[in-house]
Design a protein with these regions (language model features):
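Conserved short histidine dyad/triad with adjacent acidic residue
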Residues: 34-39, 52-68, 106
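Ligand-binding loop in jelly-roll beta-barrel domains
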Residues: 103-131
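Short, conserved beta-strand element in jelly-roll/cupin
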Residues: 53-58, 68-86, 124-128
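Short acidic-glycine-tyrosine-enriched beta hairpin
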Residues: 88-104
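A short, N-terminal "cap"/entry segment at the start of jelly-roll beta-barrel domains
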Residues: 1-48, 134-171
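Short hydrophobic/aromatic patches on the structural cores and recognition surfaces of FHA
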Residues: 80, 96, 111
Length: 171
């Protein structure tokens, strides 16, 4: 038997309208300030999917150049024009373009607004239980675990400085 739920609760768990989304403003000066982002999947029944609407002002970037080891991403350009920096290339993007980014070091990526008007797009991703991202421009990496552990509780960003031996610090 299928469990029943009242329609309002069911709608709240399953449906988001990005026209009603609450945006947060970034203040990361100078390249990322003014970027607006609204997370859509938060509070829904989705456990392995992420979605957001992002609005990037002219001359700004949505996030640093990076790649994922596990998660795939898709971006759907809703309004405006810009540039997809990917795999060492600069590719023009415009409203209607759908961008598919597989995981792996072959596809580091970043979306830049190189136009004179706002760039608005929908971001979709799988949310892996654990993930590692690398940031080639700044020589750092991000470790993410959606499971809580004694050492890794959420997100940890580190710069690659030392290459430690496997046994370093062990008794």
């Amino acid at each position: 038997m299928i469990p029943t739920m009242n329609p309002e609760d069911l709608r709240a768990k399953l449906i988001r309208n990005f026209n009603d989304a609450k945006f947060e403003m970034s203040d990361r000066v100078p390249l990322y300030d003014g970027v607006q982002s609204a997370r859509l999947a938060s509070g829904t029944a989705a456990e392995k999917m992420g979605a957001s609407i992002d609005i990037v002002p002219p001359g700004k970037r949505a996030c640093p150049y990076h790649f994922h080891y596990v998660e795939e991403e898709m971006f759907i350009v809703l309004e405006g024009e810009g540039t997809l920096r990917v795999a060492g290339e600069m590719l023009p993007i415009r409203a209607g373009d759908t961008i598919f980014i597989p995981p792996g070091p072959e596809y580091p990526h970043q979306i830049l607004n190189t136009s004179g008007k706002p760039l608005k797009y929908l971001s979709l991703s799988v949310n892996a239980e654990t993930e590692i991202c690398e940031y080639p421009d700044s020589n750092k990496y991000l470790a993410v675990s959606r499971k809580k552990g004694p050492m890794l509780d959420g997100r940890r960003m580190h710069r690659v400085k030392d290459d430690l031996d496997y046994w370093d610090g062990e008794a």
